[in-house]
Amino acid sequence: ESGADAGLVLQQIRQAIRFHRKFLASDQDRHKRIHWFDPSWWQRNIKKLFSRPKTAGFGYTAAAWRRSSQAVFRAAGQQKALLASPPQESTGLPNTLPLSASLGYYNLHGVPDSAEWFGQRAFNDPLIGPDYPVALTPANLRSNGHRPDVIFSEACYGANLRDEKTTTSSIALRFLSIGAHAFVGSTCTSYGAVTMPLAGADLMAYRFWKLLR
């Protein structure tokens, strides 16, 4: 974040320390409670070994890229439909929605001189409205005690922090300020596929989610 105030950086450091301390404590506690001759313990852990926990995800895409975005979202273990813009716009977006899931995937337009991310109308969309509506702004991300753990954004300039970006002028910084552990995004232009097969940023996002799982 720009300026002399290191508050956001210090917040990230404290958050990382808390996370790793909590993880270490739970790991030590788990080892203390292991009962090697307890059949129920073996049964529980064998089930865990061969099953993947379901993690809630939130996906938001430009309507023009819905098909390729859905393929990427499935790689994150998400079978539900993504939110698409249009018809969704930032003004009608519930503030709790982007913060309600552990994983956040965004395939929207971004520009270097604006804090907003934009949707894009599908070529055959009959609805009346702007071709590139504002889909998400930092104001949509209000701290409410919930936050995603990991965000992957394909937006052009989605992780661009030049030109004195702050939590009110950067969605990436806004996510981090409310407690997200990681934000993956582009500092420049980012290209993907309109439809299948996946390419460019879409393929990178697909492999990211696959490996993260």
Provide a role label for each language-model segment.
Residues 46-49, 53, 57-169, 188:
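Catalytic-core segments of thiol-dependent peptidases
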Residues 8, 106-109, 203-208:
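Broad hydrophobic/π-residue packing in well-ordered secondary structure
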Residues 1-78:
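Structured catalytic cores of large enzymes
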Residues 150-213:
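Active-site-proximal C-terminal subdomain of hydrolase catalytic domains
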Residues 11-13, 61, 108, 148-149, ...:
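Generic hydrophobic/packing signal
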